[in-house]
Amino acid sequence: MELPQEYIDKMVNLLGEEEFSLYLASLEEERSFGVRVNTLKISNEDFLENLGEIINVKKVIPWTNDGYYYAPFEKENTELPGKLPFYHAGLYYIQEPSAMYPAQQLDVKPGDKVLDLCAAPGGKSTKLGVKLSGEGLLVANDISQERVKALIYNLELAGVRNVVVTNESPERLAKKFNGYFDKILVDAPCSGEGMFRKDNEAVKSWGKFKTEVCAGMQREILEYAHVMLKPGGHILYSTCTFDPSEDEYMIKEFMEKFPEYELLPLEKRGGITDGLYGMSEAARLWPHKLKGEGHFTAMLEKKTQAKEENSKKSDCEKKSNNNKSYKVLKDAPDEFKTYWKKNMQGDIPSGYYYVAGDGLYFLPCVPPDIDGLKVPKIGLNMGELNHCKFKPSQQFAMAYGDMFARKITFAYDSEDVKRYLRGETITVSSDFGDGWHAVSVGVKGKTEKGYVLGTGVINGGMLKNMYPKGWRRLI
């Protein structure tokens, strides 16, 4: 790997000649691959028992409770995890191992209001959604209109029920969400030095996205995060770069400007080391000290309400707001209740139902006022209300698929599961009754344990495929 001389000089100065040689050698080694289990849909135990051999899982990633290394090229004829139907059931997320650390460390609890400020493509947001367990609220934001599409897809695939996705600048969000959030994750844009082994384009673009450019963005993002955080709340700051100006010095500068913050210690396992320059509470993940590409992480607690702007009630919580983006209903609409009673098991979801156009949406907590913001996803889209009937969405299937009264399961290596994911109509046994069914994928020989891919309507032995066009895949 050919590195820019300016970068080499900087890293030698940071690490010293001997440790830099170890770092440089690690860049020539084979990178590690990671997969994180989505425990909203499958337990770690079931994942290992049913999918461990298929994916070729090797061992647990030590700084996670749901991440595993896998070896995609060790065996012949091994399918890549992203090519398997189980991926399309949202059972796991493919993620670089060290990138799993920040969201694991942010102490999110069910019921919290959480902001992922730089969220795309969604690896950390989906983990935060798992931690919330369907309670509280996750706001996942990304400023890029293009990248936010991947963010929405990954959150919907994971079955996260309590998320609003915004496509805004931190400045505009801060005007709405003043003092609103309990926890904020800032996975800041950075010079990407921890991506060099994984992505050669990161090496080529290093000169373009230099530290001084990135530091300016990071400084601004952190200051807006401060405005949006409640007293007593936590900011988890992370980068995938090694430059102290974007890491320890950025945190030091922020704390000097906002002295009401203090650093909290992070758990360090599997080769994770302390931050540099005496910042022992922070964490460094180096590629020559562990199996991962590299990260910096620090957690800050807001101790007092030092500035007047944080004492104001958040705009999105004010009772006087006349929200024009949606209409909150007093109860679930009759069309939805009728569908649930006929096709689902268990109690109807308890929370807030609201409509925007023909769409029925749901959140477990009071929906925030998002008037004036770009919001491509305003909660869980349950489906459409049209002509006095309810038609479920793909999001509904991914979030509540296990509650369908009727399910049809195809083996993961069958032609039928491939046909389903391509959006084709499928002939099924006459043993299946007519009506709505969850369509699921099962492990060969264990098709009674199916994982939901979507829905279909059976009529006279034919399964009408309801898998959405935008999701269809050739596998």
What residues fall within each predicted segment?
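Polybasic, low-complexity RNA-engagement segments
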Residues: 1-14, 18-48, 52-54, 303-475
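A short acidic, Gly/Pro-enriched loop at the edge of an enzyme's catalytic core
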Residues: 109-110, 174-185
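Conserved class I S-adenosyl-L-methionine
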Residues: 111-120
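Conserved SAM-binding loop of SAM-dependent methyltransferases across substrates and taxa
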Residues: 121-134
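Helix-to-beta-strand junctions that scaffold the AdoMet/dcAdoMet cofactor pocket
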Residues: 133, 229-231
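S-adenosyl-L-methionine
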Residues: 141-179
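Mobile active-site "lid"/loop adjacent to the S-adenosyl-L-methionine
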Residues: 146, 182-223, 240-248, 269-270
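Class I S-adenosyl-L-methionine
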Residues: 181, 234-237, 242-361
